[in-house]
């Protein structure tokens, strides 16, 4: 659940994450269309960004790292991406297809994760204003 003071599009992002948070991991999932039966890492991040009105079409991890948003961390949403993986922090919660070392929250596919993960090797990006 998004904080009560979160902007409407951030609340929409959290709702979108909730809608797919138990879908299976499918390589390439979410790239032909935002609506899919499974998602890979960047497909899941794309789905949530689209729901927030921050992305027009699905984007692979590499371009997320190089061309989406502005460098740095946002107040509400930060995307962490490199050439082979992407995940995001939305309203303080990590949305990731990888457990990232969280042994208490296993499972592949998009999941809200409580534990932070190592950020080395990732580029932090945000949408200005968010």
Please give the residue ranges for each predicted region:
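Surface-exposed loop/turn and secondary-structure junction residues enriched for glycine/proline
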Residues: 28-30, 42, 57
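A structural motif
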Residues: 10-22
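A general structural-boundary detector
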Residues: 4, 31-32, 74
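Soluble non-cytosolic domains of exported or imported proteins
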Residues: 4-11, 35-40
């Amino acid at each position: 659940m998004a904080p009560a003071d979160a902007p409407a599009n951030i609340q929409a992002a959290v709702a979108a994450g909730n809608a797919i948070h138990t879908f299976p991991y499918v390589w390439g999932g979410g790239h032909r269309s935002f609506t899919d039966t499974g998602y890979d890492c960047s497909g899941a991040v794309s789905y949530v960004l689209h729901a927030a009105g921050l992305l027009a079409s699905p984007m692979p991890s590499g371009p997320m790292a190089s061309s989406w948003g502005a460098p740095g961390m946002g107040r509400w949403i930060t995307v962490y991406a490199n050439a082979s993986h992407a995940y995001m922090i939305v309203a303080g919660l990590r949305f990731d297809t990888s457990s990232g070392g969280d042994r208490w929250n296993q499972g592949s596919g998009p999941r809200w994760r409580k534990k932070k993960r190592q950020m080395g090797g990732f580029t932090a990006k945000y949408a200005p204003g968010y």
